[in-house]
Amino acid sequence: WIMGHMVNAIAQIDEFVNLGANSIETDVSFDSSANPEYTYHGIPCDCGRTCTKWEHFNEFLKGLRKATTPGDSKYHEKLVLVVFDLKTGSLYDNQASDAGKKLAKSLLQNYWNNGNNGGRAYIVLSIPNLAHYKLITGFKEALTSEGHPELMDKVGYDFSGNDDIGDVANAYKKAGVTGHAWQSDGITNCSLRGLDRVRKAVANRDSSNGYINKVYYWTVDKRQSTRDALDAGVDGIMTNYPDVIADVLNESAYKAKFRIASYDDNPWETFKN
């Protein structure tokens, strides 16, 4: 999965997919009542990027729905996965469940079209704080009470705080999650970070009793760091330059071993090295 980083304006969906992304990451900010409000990152952000592009969350979802609904004039067949980077840092811990419920209702209405031929992309809910695990249970409760528990098949999870892998496993246990687990590791492109924790995550994925299904690394903009991440065995790379990742995947060393994921590749299934 080539994951376009910080895609917060509808116009950027086309831009990143046309550069080679089959997945995008979108920031979601919340208001003080735990409603998802804007697709917005804010300052500071990655070096070389504009930090302030934004849409109202529900409007972004409608644009995203068009981009992922077969037959729509804006449809991109290769856009198959969306990571919502949930900026829950503005919320109190006890608002996490509410945030999950409100997020689910927004998605149901504006992305899944109330279960009637909505967008088809798989969705990853990426949560920065292990203490906010109830966002997952709230999300699930809302979809169930709205009569669409089947949509949970399209939803996966990520805790993005670079926490100890054992602590992440524990948070999933509390949330009642088994499966659909993506594990991110990384740092802003302005800094360097080693691959030690990525290797631990890959080892967990490849073990018989690990909780991780997929591992992705962020934010990778250079050819050499792309090669290093691929050599470590990641499933996804988040980037500001999807064309760089696509170029490296075309190199003879990687062409035989990796390919770009399509809609038929189940993002919740573990593919072991």
From Swiss-Prot:
Listed EC numbers: 4.6.1.-
GO cellular component, as recorded: extracellular region
InterPro entries: PLC-like_Pdiesterase_TIM-brl (IPR017946)
Catalytic reaction annotation: an N-(acyl)-sphingosylphosphocholine = an N-(acyl)-sphingosyl-1,3-cyclic phosphate + choline; an N-(acyl)-sphingosylphosphoethanolamine = an N-(acyl)-sphingosyl-1,3-cyclic phosphate + ethanolamine; a 1-acyl-sn-glycero-3-phosphocholine = a 1-acyl-sn-glycero-2,3-cyclic phosphate + choline; a 1-acyl-sn-glycero-3-phosphoethanolamine = a 1-acyl-sn-glycero-2,3-cyclic phosphate + ethanolamine
Cellular compartment(s): Secreted
Free-text comment on the cofactor: Binds 1 Mg(2+) ion per subunit.
Keyword annotations from UniProtKB, A to Z: Cytolysis, Dermonecrotic toxin, Disulfide bond, Glycoprotein, Hemolysis, Lipid degradation, Lipid metabolism, Lyase, Magnesium, Metal-binding, Secreted, Toxin
Positions contributing to Mg(2+) binding: 25, 27, 85
Residues annotated as the enzyme's active site: 5, 41 (nucleophile)
Function: Dermonecrotic toxins cleave the phosphodiester linkage between the phosphate and headgroup of certain phospholipids (sphingolipid and lysolipid substrates), forming an alcohol (often choline) and a cyclic phosphate. This toxin acts on sphingomyelin (SM). It may also act on ceramide phosphoethanolamine (CPE), lysophosphatidylcholine (LPC) and lysophosphatidylethanolamine (LPE), but not on lysophosphatidylserine (LPS), and lysophosphatidylglycerol (LPG). It acts by transphosphatidylation, releasing exclusively cyclic phosphate products as second products.
Name of the featured protein: Dermonecrotic toxin LapSicTox-alphaIB1bi
Source species: Loxosceles apachea (Apache recluse spider)
